[in-house]
Design a protein with these regions (language model features):
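Residues in the short beta-alpha loop(s) of Rossmann-like NAD(P)-binding domains
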Residues: 42-43, 76, 149
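Rossmann-fold NAD(P) dinucleotide-binding segment
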Residues: 60-125
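Rossmann-fold dinucleotide-binding core
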Residues: 19, 105-163
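NAD(P)+-binding Rossmann beta1-loop-alpha1 motif at the extreme N-terminus of oxidoreductases
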Residues: 8-72, 134
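Short low-complexity, flexible loop/linker segments enriched in glycine and/or proline
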Residues: 53-55, 71, 75, 118, ...
Length: 163
C-alpha cells in the first residue's frame, strides 16, 4: 500500500513499459517533466536511449514492486496481459493501491480481463489508448481516451497532461 506521502506525480516512481515509436518519446516527456521513471523494453537500444535521458532500467517484477503508477505502451493486448500476468510479470510483485494504465490499442475484452485481474489485487486499471501518432507523442499533444474507475483516472490525470 502506498502512503499519502508517496502519492503524487513528482514523488512516486512511475514504470513505463514499451519504448517503441510512441513509447520512447512519451517516456522522455515524462522525464523532462521531472517524473522518476523505471523503464523496460525488449529493444535494448531503446532502453539505453531513455536511460541516457535519465530513466533507470528495470524488470517487469521490479517495476511492479517499486512503482506506484505503471504505463504500458505495447503493440497488442496479448503482450500487455503477458507483461502483467506472466510468472515474473508486473502483477507478481505489485502493491495494493498501484494504478496501471494501458495506453496500447487493446480489445474491450482484453482490457476487462486486465481490469478484473488487477482489481483482485487492490490495483487500479485505466484503459487509455491514444491518438496523434509519433508527432503527437514527441510534442506531448496526444489525445487520450481513458476508461476506468474515476479514482484511477484521477491518479493518472497529471501524467496524461504531460503526454
Amino acid at each position: 500500500m502506498w502512503s499519502e506521502k508517496e502519492k503524487g506525480c513528482m514523488k512516486m516512481k512511475v514504470g513505463f513499459i514499451g519504448l517503441g515509436i510512441m513509447g520512447r518519446p512519451m517516456a522522455k516527456n515524462l522525464l523532462n517533466a521531472g517524473v522518476e521513471l523505471l523503464v523496460s523494453d525488449l529493444n535494448k537500444e531503446a532502453v539505453a536511449d531513455v536511460v541516457a535521458a535519465g530513466a533507470k532500467e528495470a524488470t517487469y517484477a521490479e517495476i511492479g514492486e517499486q512503482c506506484g503508477r505503471i504505463i504500458i505502451m505495447v503493440p497488442s493486448g496479448a503482450i500487455s496481459k503477458s507483461i502483467l500476468f506472466d510468472e515474473d510479470g508486473v502483477a507478481s510483485t505489485i502493491k495494493e493501491g498501484t494504478v496501471v494504465c494501458d495506453m496500447s490499442s487493446v480489445t474491450p475484452v482484453e482490457s476487462k480481463e486486465c481490469y478484473e485481474g488487477l482489481k483482485d489485487k487492490g490495483v487500479g486499471f485505466v484503459d487509455a489508448p491514444v491518438s496523434g501518432g509519433e508527432p503527437g507523442a514527441v510534442a506531448g499533444t496526444l489525445a487520450i481516451m481513458a476508461g476506468g474507475d474515476q479514482e484511477d483516472f484521477d491518479a493518472m490525470k497529471e501524467y496524461f497532461d504531460i503526454l
